[in-house]
Amino acid sequence: MTSSIDNLFTPGLVAAQQPQWPGGSDGAAVKSAVQELKSLPPLVFAGECDDLKARIALAAEGKAFWLQGGDCAETFVAATADSIRNRIKTILQMAAVLQYYSSIPVVKVGRMAGQFAKPRSNDLETRGDVTLPAYRGDAVNDLEFTQSARTPDPQRLVRVYNTSAATLNLVRAFTQGGFADLRRVHEWNKGFIRDSSVGTRYEEMANEIGRALAFMTSAGVDPDAFKSVDFFSSHEALILEYEKALTRIDSLSGNPYDVSAHFLWIGERTRQLDGAHIDFASKIKNPIGVKLGPKSTVEDALALIDRLDPDREPGRMTFITRMGAANIRKVLPALVDGVTKSGAKVLWVCDPMHGNTYEAPSGYKTRKFDDVMDEVKGFFEVHKSLGTHPGGIHIELTGDDVTECVGGGEQISESDLASRYESACDPRLNHSQSLELAFLVAEMLRDR
């Protein structure tokens, strides 16, 4: 088994966006962390990954809808029970609204339990006359701007595993132990409508859901499906020492799976066809996503499909588009049309966050809620015009009442950003903005 894993990946390939570990990637510190990770139990199981792959195949055919959400970058300090519960609660609330109005299952995926690393535009950060390594996520170094905090530490990869294990333990408890009961989720949504300044717009939608639940209760319908949900984990496969160390051979099928998460995606900055990240993704059997930005071409998309899904396996391949509101209607049609004409079946997911980031005068990175919604709207418009399926959304969000994105029903302004800006990296939709987005997307699903 060990020799199979050791010989699985192509050696000598360039791996973009990797940390500059002290002593190098072959140093004693990295080897020690990797050996420890290799000895640890899987965080997820191959059968769960295959289950998710089957659901992705349904979403690609328009028979399910993908909802993926969570932090831009998880941090160790924020991996508390309250924070994890609030994120799960937000995703469950969004899913209930989307599922009712689409009348199809919603595949619930957390951008959590592993999203501890981030690619960066620059290796270094300068403040005044001090230059230090850039913060690459808690998997690599610390946000504090000191030499010791910013020095990459491979032992943090072991802490990523331990924190992810604790997070997944809570996720499973919350989603299987009654917390996720659909009737409880509906009561939460009623609370949002009661307390939100835009709640009246969605009151009738919520009342419809309430009447449907009341009817089923009166008819004696009480299925187990009401009481628990299936919830999957995902993160960007970025730090290859971590991902390779957590790749295992499944005892039943004999196939390799990355057991750090159910779903892994390759980012826009690391999807080089001849690079180590695509080589890694091509060798594992998990469902795989790839981010496509505004400069992506049909040729790029088709080459990625050939490399990652040569057998055209249903549910294997997801494209997560991150175009920006100004580009989505111009760039996406050719991509979707070209892939569709090739005969490949992929899931198309809209990431309306990363293409709409800008710096406010105060220096905070932020996003306009209206831009986020406009990109989602453009995504739906393109698929409707082509007769294809808008398969899902990928949202950076938190369950907390932060002030990181401007606009929405709460009318957060650029001057409000400083009041509660907590993200370690990019701005996230807060709880209220996330639910508002879900109600707006539900209207699009109803009319698709």
Q: What are the language-model segments listed below?
A:
Residues 301-304, 310, 316-348, 354-403:
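Non-transmembrane, aqueous-exposed alpha-helical and coiled segments at domain scale
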Residues 2-139:
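Long, contiguous, compositionally biased segments that the model treats as domain-scale units
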Residues 1-40, 407-448:
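N-terminal charge/polar-biased segments
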